[in-house]
Every structure is written in C-alpha cells, then in structure tokens.
C-alpha cells in the first residue's frame, strides 16, 4: 500500500485543477520573481502571449507605443481595436519628451505606455525618465527586454510597472522552447483586486484572466526556463564577446550596422533580399538568442520606417568561424579587418 501523499503541493489559492499552476511553473515563477525583484511573475506559453496577456490584464483605454515597439504587439492590438474601446497612439520615440507628453495629455485611463529596451535597432530607452513622466499622468509603463534578456536589462529597477520577456530567446537559449513571462512591480498589485467577469472560484483576478485566455505554461517549458537561468550568465557573456568582435569588424569595414553593446543581436542596413541565402552556416529563422547563429531578413520600412535590414543573431560558435561565413555572404574581405580588431581587443 502506498504511503499517504499530499499531492496538493501548490498553494490552492493559485491553483485550479493544477491547470494554471503546477510545481514546475510555481518554482520557476518564484525564481524569476527574485531575479527581477518583482511583486509577481506570470509564466506564459510564449513571449507574444505574455504581451497580449499583460494588455488584457490592464485593459487600457489608451495604448501608447513608438515606431520601435515590437511589431507583432502593434499589429495585434490594431486588429483588436475593431471590438475593444481603446485609443491607439503611435509616436516616433518614447524618448521624445514633448511627443510623449502630448500623447499623455487628455488620454483616457487606464493608460499603458509600451516600448522595447533595447530595441532591435540598438536603442536603449530612458526607462526612468519615460516612467516618471508617464506616472505624472497616471499611466503605467511596460517594457520588453527580450533583445538582451533580464541578464542585461531589468526595467523594473528603473521604475517600469511591467516587464515582458520572451524566454524563447536567450533564457532558454536553444531555440526549442516556447515560453514568456510577465514581471509585475508593486504598483500593479491592484490587478489582483479588480473585478473580472465570471470570476473563477479560488483564483484571484490575475490568474482568472490568464486561465480564461488559455495562456498556460506547461511544466516542461517551465523546467527549460529554470534550467536556462543556470547558464544564462555564461552564455550572455559569450554572445556579447563574439557579437562585439563581429560588430566592430563590420563597422570598420564601413557597413551600416547597429548593436546595443549587449547580447548577440546585430542589425545590418541595406542588405539585398538574397543576402540570407548566401550563408553556409547561419540559419535563416525568425528568432534570436540561440546557441546557433541565425539571420533574418525583413523589409523594415513597412512598419519601422527605416528601410531594409537584416538581423544577425550571433551564437556560441567560434567567432573566427562566423566571420568567415559573414565574409563570404557579404562578398567583401573581412578577415584581415577582423584579425586587427581581435588584436586590439586582446590589447585592451
């Protein structure tokens, strides 16, 4: 006969038939909460769903974004606008104080200001300044830090109310797991007290919304996130070191290139559509932050108003090997420049 076991290992106030939570999810959320210094972290089934769920939780009457805010978030919200009562405002830059102030004035509350820090285009937002101004108008700020992960960017520390991250990228790091997260500051505790239609017995407001959306992180993904956190520091340092070498080489070769200074994501301007097809090693996929290097071409003028660009995600391979693949893809000599840059780096 089996011994008596208590299978109800998760706080029953946050559990409904073990669907919204289980031990793996609860454990990983607690790890992330401590790392962010957050009031609460909600593990989601993807980064995009984390963004959508955060918006569903706040239910803004005004959403303010800028030209570099994650494209899928903006497209999805504009699609939703057909049946929700919300004003959508897109400005050129959240760092433009006058433009942001103008958009906040007379905006309907709740107001949610959304940005990326850093963005695909290597711009680090002044989160402290943006959040301070937004709070003067009773607005909340949400920043996506997926481009460099929580290892390098934690907007909560600079006054943001919400941080959303795609753990599919650097945190899991292998391109084989879908997961995302919402980190909430103390300022968002009101979300658990707000009224929700048809509340779920035993669940507070936040988990009721998460449950209703079907945004359920599975135990294996939670485990992958937790495991990824163990090696995140080592991997991020390697991504950064290799990407810095390659960025400096491309810049010295007079190629239009942008890099935030952290992580492995590099953006190149003016590449032809067949550029990504020339690689022998770089894989053409629409993600980044993986152990393997990949490239992704997109026509950014369609939504970023910035022209044609290609994102290179520098993986954990030997940068000597990677620069040779980039050299043959660009069809310009880079090796000697690379050796010079590498030598200068060693001297530093």
Predicted features along the sequence, with ranges:
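N-terminal "arm"/small-domain region of PLP-dependent enzymes with the aminotransferase-like
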Residues: 1-23, 28-31, 311-313
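Structural beta-strand/beta-sheet cores of well-ordered domains, especially the beta-sheet scaffolds
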Residues: 3, 178-180, 264-266
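Generic alpha-helix structural propensity
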Residues: 23-27, 45-49, 283, 321
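A short, N-terminal amphipathic alpha-helix
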Residues: 32-36
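Conserved PLP-enzyme active-site core in the AAT-like
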Residues: 40-257, 338-343, 347
């Amino acid at each position: 006969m089996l011994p008596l076991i208590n299978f109800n290992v998760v706080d029953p106030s946050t559990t409904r038939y073990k669907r919204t939570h289980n031990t793996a999810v609860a454990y990983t959320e607690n790890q992330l909460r401590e790392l962010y210094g957050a009031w609460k972290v909600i593990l989601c089934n993807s980064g995009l769903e984390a963004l959508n769920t955060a918006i569903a939780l706040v239910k803004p009457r005004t959403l303010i974004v800028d030209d570099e805010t994650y494209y899928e978030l903006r497209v999805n919200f504009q699609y939703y606008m057909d049946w929700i009562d919300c004003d959508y405002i897109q400005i050129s830059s959240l760092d433009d104080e006058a433009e942001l102030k103008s958009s906040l004035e007379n905006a309907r509350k709740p107001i949610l200001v959304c940005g990326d820090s850093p963005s695909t285009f290597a711009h680090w937002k002044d989160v402290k300044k943006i959040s301070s101004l937004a709070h003067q108008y009773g607005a909340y700020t949400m920043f996506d830090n997926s481009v460099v992960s929580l290892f390098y960017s934690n907007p909560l520390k600079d006054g943001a109310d919400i941080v959303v991250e795609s753990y599919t990228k650097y945190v899991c790091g292998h391109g084989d797991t879908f997961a995302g997260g919402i980190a909430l500051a103390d300022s968002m505790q009101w979300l658990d007290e707000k009224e929700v239609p048809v509340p779920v017995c035993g669940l507070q407001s936040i988990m009721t919304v998460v449950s209703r959306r079907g945004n359920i992180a599975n135990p294996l993904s939670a485990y992958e996130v937790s495991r990824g956190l163990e090696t995140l520091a080592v991997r991020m340092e390697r991504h950064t070191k290799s990407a810095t070498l390659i960025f400096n080489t491309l810049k010295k070769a007079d190629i239009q290139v942008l890099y935030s200074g952290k992580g492995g994501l590099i953006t190149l301007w003016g590449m032809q559509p067949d550029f990504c097809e020339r690689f022998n090693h770089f894989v053409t996929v629409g993600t980044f932050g993986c152990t393997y290097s990949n490239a992704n071409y997109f026509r950014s003028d369609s939504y970023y108003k910035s022209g044609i660009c290609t994102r290179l995600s520098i993986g954990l391979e030997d940068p000597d090997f990677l620069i040779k693949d980039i050299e043959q893809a660009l069809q310009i000599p880079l090796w000697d420049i690379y050796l010079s840059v590498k030598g200068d780096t060693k001297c530093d």
